Structures are given as C-alpha cells and as structure tokens.
C-alpha cells in the first residue's frame, strides 16, 4: 500500500513509523533520511519531489499547488522605480486621527509592499488585491516569512 512507503524514496518505514513532510496542503509520508534531505528545500521543490515516484498522497492537490506557486511568481507586482519584485508586509490600518477621540474618524486598511532593491514603499487596497488568488498566495507567503 502506498501509505506504507516513503513518498520520496519508496522504501518501507523503519521500526519507528518515521514521519510526514508538509508539501503544500498535504502531508506526505517520509523516512527519516528523506526528511533530513527535504528540510532546506522550498515548498515548490518538495511538491515536485513528492510527485516523482507516483505514490504521493493526493497528487492532484500537489499539482494544483505547483501551478499556484509558479503562476503566482509571474503575478508578483514590480517596482515602478527600478522594476524589481515587490515584497508584501502585513496589512495595516492608516488612521487620520491617532487619538481616536471619535468613532467617526477616518481610517482605512492598506496592504504595504516594498522593493528590496531601491527601498520604494507602495500601498495597495487589500480588498482588491486579495481577489486575485495568485496575489493572495504571495501575500500569505510574504507575511509569514
């Protein structure tokens, strides 16, 4: 049975039931040696390696995740000044009245992004940006890092 084998090397687990490795939204069975090898790899590389042997758990989810990761990098916004990629930071609320003495004071949510090359800082409307599934993935990835 496929669940009794390491997804990455195809070997049967040892005496200690070994472990699982997170590949996208799925947990894949792995032996201790493969887990050590996969520790430094990116999510994309782990997903690709899980599909090689053809015994991965939920391979369709892995393929969807690979497509999401590769397409999202193509959708990453570029800096208007130098053309480098922008990196998102956590969503923030800008407040017109810092003392908040009135419940009617103006405030709005923004999604900041910055350029690591030239330092330019841009603000995006989070409601609009999060509608694009590729950008939503990038936001989650950047803000968790």
Residue spans for each PLM region:
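Residues immediately within or flanking Cys/His clusters that coordinate Zn2+
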Residues: 3-6, 28, 73-76, 112
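Short cysteine-rich clusters marking metal-coordination/redox-active sites
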Residues: 6-9, 31-34, 79-82, 115
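Short Cys/His-rich Zn2+-coordinating modules
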Residues: 11-19, 54-69, 95-102
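Short linker/helix segments within small regulatory modules
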Residues: 18-28, 95-112
């Amino acid at each position: 049975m496929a669940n009794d084998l390491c997804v990455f090397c195809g070997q049967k687990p040892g005496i200690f039931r070994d472990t699982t490795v997170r590949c996208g939204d799925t947990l894949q069975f792995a032996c201790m040696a493969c887990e050590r090898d996969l520790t430094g790899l990116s999510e994309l590389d782990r997903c690709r390696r899980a599909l090689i042997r053809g015994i991965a758990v939920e391979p369709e989810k892995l393929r969807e995740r690979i497509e999401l990761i590769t397409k999202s990098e193509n959708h990453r916004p570029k800096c208007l000044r130098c053309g480098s990629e922008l990196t998102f930071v956590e969503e923030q609320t800008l407040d017109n009245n810092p003392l908040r003495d009135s419940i009617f004071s103006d405030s709005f949510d923004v999604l900041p992004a910055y350029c690591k090359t030239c330092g330019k800082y841009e603000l995006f409307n989070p409601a609009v940006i999060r509608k694009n599934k590729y950008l939503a993935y990038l936001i989650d990835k950047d803000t968790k890092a």
